[in-house]
């Protein structure tokens, strides 16, 4: 089976109802892995999944918690994912 994410694009003003994930480094570059749930209050649409990109229209209340130590990412060819590396 092919290991891939299926991307969808949504447009309009959505409200972030949940956002969770982590910011690590892979190959010396920042690596974001975010999961989002967002709601379109005018059309009753809920979208959820991996967040690849977004534009904040006004504000977003996002808190970042810094952990002690270093956490990175490494590619695991066997399962086809970039795994956390402590």
Describe each PLM feature range.
Residues 1-32, 37-86:
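N-terminal intrinsically disordered, cationic/polar leader segments
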């Amino acid at each position: 089976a092919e290991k891939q994410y299926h991307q969808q694009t949504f447009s309009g003003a959505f409200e972030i109802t949940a956002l969770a994930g982590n910011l690590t480094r892979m190959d010396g570059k920042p690596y974001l892995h975010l999961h989002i749930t967002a709601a379109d209050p005018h059309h009753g649409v809920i979208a959820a999944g991996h967040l690849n990109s977004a534009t904040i229209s006004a504000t977003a209340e996002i808190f970042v918690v810094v952990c002690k130590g270093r956490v990175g990412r490494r590619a695991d060819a066997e399962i086809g994912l970039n795994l956390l590396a402590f």
